[in-house]
Amino acid sequence: MRYLVQERIFSFTADFWIEDENGDRVFFVDGRAMSLRETFELRDASGAIRVIIRKKLFALRDTMDIEDGDGVIATVRPAFFSPIRHRYEVTLADGSRLEATGNFADKDWELTSDGRLVGRISRQWFRIRDTYGVEVGPGEDDALIIAIAVCIDRIHEDEERKRHEQRPFGGGFGQF
């Protein structure tokens, strides 16, 4: 199944809908970015919370947890330095791992488990600004894969913002 994620980057609340390939609204991301701890709720079309995404406050690397009613089901973080390409790792509650590799700035990457494709994220399927597609592999948990995509997108944006802020004079003309 393929989903359309259209973020409202400049929205005060960071809320946005996720549509299926038929254009039906199937998930709603309720962003609580203004809270002390960045939190998102992924709700289904009826309003029921499927998962909650929380940014960890105290972690060496930017880290987000995905929780359901029973607790943390996945933890998403950047992989340690990889000279070949950017990577993110996802640790599931049962200890298994997923790996995300690709071009995160262009939103064109894959999510694999032991070499098996479980999800693909691509901006190339759509020509709408701030929009990308999430394709979920057969038999995979749609809400979990979408939540992982939201986490990686958010962590990557935070990393890019921090990198920009670390440049001399913030990357701009500076203050004189």
Language-model features: where?
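Intrinsically disordered, low-complexity proline/glycine-rich segments
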Residues: 1-176
